[in-house]
Amino acid sequence: MSAAAQLILHLTALNTPERVVSIGKVEAAGATNVIPDRVYMEGTMRTFDERERAEVKRRIEELAAANDASYGVRTRVHFTPGYPCVVNDPELIRQAVALAETEGIPFQMLPLRMTSEDFGFYGTRYPAIFYRLGVGPGAGKLHTSTFNPDGAAIPTGIRFMELLARNYFNR
């Protein structure tokens, strides 16, 4: 358990504004007076680009190996292939902003986020833009049981998506 706890601390130290590593699940089959012979951990890693993701993976492997040497344990690191980083095409962003301004659709530029979505696969093959549709205050947080968006936002979302598509194909 001590080795696992130390590894979690080392992994957390990797966090910067450009990358996040977190362990959200730890399982150990011990008891109050029995030190477990195995500890299983799962976590997530988020970055803004694939180059940084590869670097974080390399650092995780290094930290695990150093931790193994310090504690006399063996760590098996396994990375489950996840979604690629969501990267917006700068030209599509420019076009979307211009369309929103021209059409009087309110918008707000958000700071970069480490979005993990299957949409990231599209951006690896085609110019793509991932945007969020504001659904009003009090809608609750996304991916929670309290999320209750205002349905009146849907027509605006449909209209904006149609405008983006028409603009893209008419250029």
Please provide the spans of the model-predicted regions.
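Midchain, well-structured core segments that form catalytic/ion-binding scaffolds
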Residues: 1-88, 113-120
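Charged catalytic carboxylate motif
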Residues: 3, 59, 95, 156, ...
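Sec/Tat-exported extracytoplasmic proteins
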Residues: 11-15, 100-103, 168
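Alpha-helix N-cap and loop-to-helix initiation/capping positions
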Residues: 55, 88-91, 149-152
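Hydrophobic "lid"/C-terminal helical patch
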Residues: 60, 64, 100, 161, ...
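Short, low-order "capping/linker" segments at domain edges
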Residues: 86-99
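Zn-dependent metallopeptidase/amidohydrolase metal-coordination segment
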Residues: 105-171
